[in-house]
Design a protein with these regions (language model features):
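Active-site loop/oxyanion-hole signature of alpha/beta-hydrolase fold enzymes
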Residues: 1-7, 155
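A short beta-to-alpha transition loop/helix N-cap that caps and shapes the active-site region
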Residues: 40-51, 116
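A catalytic-pocket lid/entrance helix-loop region that shapes and gates access to the active site
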Residues: 48-72
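Active-site nucleophile elbow and catalytic-triad environment of alpha/beta-hydrolase enzymes
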Residues: 81-98
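Conserved alpha/beta-hydrolase "acid-adjacent" motif
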Residues: 115-121
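Catalytic active-site module of serine/aspartate enzymes centered on a nucleophile-bearing elbow/loop
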Residues: 132-134, 139-176
C-alpha cells in the first residue's frame, strides 16, 4: 500500500481473507472501498469436502502441472494450503471479527456455484459489516468468477470502483 503514495485505491482482492484482515485492522484512509471475490470468513463443511476432493485431483490429474505455472514450489504451496484447511484444528478458523472494523464500502462477488463456500459467507458480511455491503451473485461461476465469468466480474468491480471513487460522468476517467 505504501507504493501507492497519495492514490485513493479501491482494494480488489482474490485473496479476500487477506483484504478483510487488512481493511478490518488498518484504518488506511487511502482505501476508499474493498471488493472481495469469493470470500471466506469461516470454514464451512462444503469447504472441507471440496478441499478434500481437490487433494485427490492433485494426485491423479494434471492439476499439479496447471498450478506449477503460478508456484515455484507447487507441492509446498498446494499441500500447505490443503493441509491447513483439512487440519481438524482449522475448523474453528474465523475472521468475521474483522468485518465489524471495516470503514469503507464493501463489494462481494460470489459465484452461484462456488464449490468452496456458500451464501453464508455473504450473510456473515452483511451481519457484521458497519459499512454498506454490495453483493453481486454471478450465475455460471464457481469459486473463481474472475476466470469463469470475467465479463460479469469486471462489470461488477468497475461499477463498484466507479461509485466509491466518485467517477460518474467519465470526465475523470474510469476505474477498473
Amino acid at each position: 500500500m505504501e507504493l501507492l503514495d497519495d492514490a485513493a485505491p479501491a482494494v480488489v482482492a482474490r485473496g479476500a481473507s487477506i483484504a478483510t484482515i487488512y481493511t478490518g485492522s488498518h484504518q488506511d484512509h487511502r482505501v476508499e472501498g474493498v471488493a472481495l471475490i469469493a470470500p471466506h470468513f469461516i470454514v464451512e463443511d462444503i469447504s472441507v469436502a471440496s478441499i478434500a476432493q481437490i487433494r485427490n485431483a492433485y494426485a491423479t490429474t494434471n492439476l499439479k502441472e496447471k498450478l506449477s505455472r503460478w508456484h515455484r514450489d507447487v507441492d509446498n504451496a498446494f499441500y500447505g494450503w490443503n493441509g491447513a484447511w483439512l487440519d481438524p484444528d482449522f475448523r474453528s478458523w474465523d475472521i468475521s471479527e474483522y468485518l465489524a472494523y471495516i470503514r469503507v464500502p464493501v463489494a462481494i462477488l460470489q459465484g452461484v456455484d462456488d464449490q468452496y463456500g456458500t451464501m453464508r459467507q455473504v450473510e456473515i458480511a452483511r451481519e457484521e459489516c458497519y459499512c454498506p455491503v454490495d453483493v453481486t451473485v454471478i450465475p455460471g461461476a464457481g469459486h473463481q468468477p474472475h476466470r469463469e465469468a470475467p465479463g460479469a466480474t469486471l462489470d461488477a468491480i468497475s461499477e463498484f470502483a466507479n461509485a466509491v471513487l466518485h467517477v460518474d460522468d467519465g470526465s475523470q476517467g474510469r476505474a477498473a
